[in-house]
């Protein structure tokens, strides 16, 4: 699939604008995050947009704001999910404007690894309480997501619930998947894109980072470079994994230099050596 692009896709979300306060005294969270302040607006020119960056860089905050502004439940699920277990989302969605194209998604889902358990619980609860119509679980492979492993339930959701012409927002989906199953997810994403879907994804996965034709934004806390468009190979994530895999043992030795020294030289041995050395000084 190298070199294969999907630029012809018409996205529902064309652009997102964040109304950053002009008054610096109002620069509290989430506007205290450099990436939120600097991005201003995000244009979506590809059906797959990826946000990557270190923990705390603002990936999930931005993705969550877009999802909630688009009408999704902050904790995840389709637009029909209304459950709430804990109000932890930021208020950035209130200052988020979504510019939509003429295309309208026929389906949609906001998937968060951290609250996927709550989504699965809500599906089971609705099936128990709503007696009329087909059971919801039939759209998820016919088996409760709680009766599958985390990775199995995630892929079951994508394989059975997601269809073409959808808007799908994933917050760190790799948390549920092995590297091999991340490749399986990539195949599903590319299939759904060909069927007219749009994906917004935040990730720490070098596998997902390399989805063909994806538009990539790298976030950091570096002033002036907190929100940058780039290629996969230019990201800190890609460069880190490339360097690590070339020389994993050397990286570990450098990282754990002091710990490895202590492993070879237990503290009681070091104390005896220091004691003997000090005695020689005294005599």
Where are these regions (language model features)?
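N-terminal pre-Walker A segment at the start of P-loop NTPase domains
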Residues: 4-40
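The conserved Walker
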Residues: 54-55
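ABC ATPase nucleotide-binding domain signature region
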Residues: 50, 61-128
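Conserved D-loop beta-strand region of ABC ATPase nucleotide-binding domains
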Residues: 62, 201-202
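C-terminal lobe/lid and adjacent interdomain/linker elements of RecA-like ASCE P-loop ATPase modules
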Residues: 180-198, 205-283
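Conserved glycine(s) of the Walker
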Residues: 58
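GG-anchored amphipathic helix commonly corresponding to the ABC/SMC/Rad50 NBD signature/C-loop
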Residues: 140, 144, 148-172, 180-192
């Amino acid at each position: 699939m190298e070199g294969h692009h999907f630029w012809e896709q018409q996205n529902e979300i064309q652009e997102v604008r964040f109304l950053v306060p002009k008054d610096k005294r109002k620069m509290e969270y989430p506007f205290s995050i450099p990436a939120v302040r600097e991005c201003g607006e995000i244009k979506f020119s590809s059906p797959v947009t990826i946000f990557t960056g270190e923990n705390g860089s603002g990936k999930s905050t931005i993705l969550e704001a877009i999802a909630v502004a688009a009408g999704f439940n902050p904790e995840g699920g389709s637009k029909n999910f209304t459950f709430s277990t804990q109000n932890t989302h930021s208020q950035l969605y209130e200052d988020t404007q979504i510019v939509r194209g003429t295309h309208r998604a026929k389906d949609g889902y906001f998937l968060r690894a951290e609250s996927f358990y709550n989504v699965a619980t809500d599906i089971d609860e609705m099936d128990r309480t709503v007696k009329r119509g087909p059971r919801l679980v039939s759209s998820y492979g016919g088996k409760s997501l709680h009766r599958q492993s985390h990775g199995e339930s995630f892929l079951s959701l994508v394989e059975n619930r997601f269809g073409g012409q959808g808007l799908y927002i994933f917050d760190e989906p790799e948390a549920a998947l092995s590297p091999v199953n991340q490749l399986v997810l990539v195949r599903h994403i590319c299939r759904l894109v060909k069927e007219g879907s749009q994906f917004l994804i935040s990730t720490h996965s070098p596998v997902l980072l390399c989805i063909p034709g994806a538009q990539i934004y790298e976030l950091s806390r570096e002033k002036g470079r907190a929100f940058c468009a780039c290629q996969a190979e230019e990201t800190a994530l890609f460069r880190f994994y490339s360097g690590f895999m070339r020389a994993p043992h050397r990286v570990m030795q450098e990282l754990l230099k002091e710990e490895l020294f202590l492993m070879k030289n237990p503290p009681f041995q070091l104390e005896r050596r220091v004691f003997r050395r000090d005695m020689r000084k005294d005599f």
